[in-house]
């Protein structure tokens, strides 16, 4: 199990840590229009999943903007940002900030993604900052659990992993 801190204090992650080589576990999240989306909907394309605690914080804002910029250069790759924010808040933020290459998804309903990927912070009901890259069959080829949730993830490594898979 990954161990992380939030503002310097240890927190409990619920679920099983996902590792490179694992088949990504199934989950269900909500789109901004309240439609369900699952792992099955992501298969068939290389997928980057950027996980953030809340879209309305500085690092999460910067992380989502960075992956939106990178998504424009990647070609046929799914790029998602998942948080526990309400879908309406995600849609408002994306609209206000011109985010159109990354699709935001909400895990607020039942934390299905958070538990499946081992990123659900029990004490805060938020998701831990992390990044995953899946191949077109849903196999994990990159996984990063950021050790301090208020820090930035590595941006270059997941982008490189996704580029290596695009044919």
Curated annotation (Swiss-Prot):
PROSITE patterns: THIOREDOXIN_2, TPX
Catalytic activity, EC: 1.11.1.24
Keywords, sorted A to Z: Antioxidant, Disulfide bond, Oxidoreductase, Peroxidase, Redox-active center
Ranges of residues in domain Thioredoxin: 18-167
Reactions catalysed according to its record: a hydroperoxide + [thioredoxin]-dithiol = an alcohol + [thioredoxin]-disulfide + H2O
Record's miscellaneous remark: The active site is a conserved redox-active cysteine residue, the peroxidatic cysteine (C(P)), which makes the nucleophilic attack on the peroxide substrate. The peroxide oxidizes the C(P)-SH to cysteine sulfenic acid (C(P)-SOH), which then reacts with another cysteine residue, the resolving cysteine (C(R)), to form a disulfide bridge. The disulfide is subsequently reduced by an appropriate electron donor to complete the catalytic cycle. In this atypical 2-Cys peroxiredoxin, C(R) is present in the same subunit to form an intramolecular disulfide.
Protein name, per record: Thiol peroxidase
Organism listed in the record: Bacillus subtilis (strain 168)
Organism phylogeny: Bacteria, Bacillati, Bacillota, Bacilli, Bacillales
